[in-house]
Every structure is written in structure tokens, then in C-alpha cells.
Amino acid sequence: MNALQEDTPPGPSTVFRPPTSSRPLETPHCREIRIGIAGITITLSLCGCANARAPTLRSATADNSESTGFKNVPDLRTDQPKPPSKKRSCDPSEYRVSELKESLTTTTPSRPRTARRCIRL
């Protein structure tokens, strides 16, 4: 009574369930798309579809599918350690040297000192 046909297009009260297969159909008009997300690869076989180009910043042809994305984005597929970050030294002698340099530059007098002459009458 509630049997669903797998080849019927979706209607107002019908659930459309397309046939699923683990192997792609062998036709000259099939396109295979591989999508990699967080270590998982999804392979889509699109058969009987028309070719349409929609260039975006992340689009690539099937031949160049490994070269998508920006150059500055790190490759998350490898587990390489991060390079050590530059840390400030906590050596007290270095702090004193920088403190002395600051005090020498900030305590310069506003006008040069001159010898005062006293005039006696």
C-alpha cells in the first residue's frame, strides 16, 4: 500500500529515493567529483549532466583538483609540528640593559647647562 517506486520523480506526497550504487555508471558523460573534508573523501559520480563552468576562488578542474585553495592556508592533512615561536627572554640582566637605555634617552635636559657669571658692583 505504501510502496515507493524508486524511479518516480518527487511529487507532493511521494518521497523520491534515487538508486544508490557504490560503482559509477560507465557512460562517456559521467563526471566524478572528489571532495575532501577533514580527512574524509567523498566521491560523487554525476552522470548525464551538462558541463558548466562557474569559476570561483576555490574552483579547479578535475586534473588540478589537488591544487585548490589559497597558498597561505596550511596543509591539514599532515601532522607536522609547528615551528617554535619567538619568546621574549626573562633574563634580568637583559631587562636592566634595556631599562638603562630607556632612562638615558628620557632624562636628557631640555636646555644645555651654561656657566653662570656673577656680576658684582
Curated annotation (Swiss-Prot):
Main location as per UniProt: host cell
Gene Ontology BP, a term: symbiont-mediated activation of host apoptosis
Subcellular location field: Host nucleus
Compositionally biased tracts (Basic and acidic residues): 88-102
Alphabetical list of Pfam families matching this protein: CAV_VP3
Biased composition (Polar residues): 58-70
InterPro entries linked to this entry: CAV_VP3
Stretches for region Disordered: 1-28, 57-121
Top-level taxon: Viruses
UniProt induction comment: VP1 and VP2 are detected 12 hours post infection, while VP3 only after 24 hours.
GO cellular component: host cell nucleus
Disulfide bonds: none
Keywords attached to this entry: Apoptosis, Early protein, Host nucleus, Host-virus interaction, Inhibition of host mitotic exit by virus, Modulation of host cell cycle by virus
Protein role: May act as transcriptional regulator. Induces apoptosis in infected cells. Element of infectious replication cycle.
Family: Belongs to the gyrovirus apoptin family.
Annotated protein name in UniProt: Apoptin
Organism whose genome encodes this protein: Chicken anemia virus (isolate Japan 82-2) (CAV)
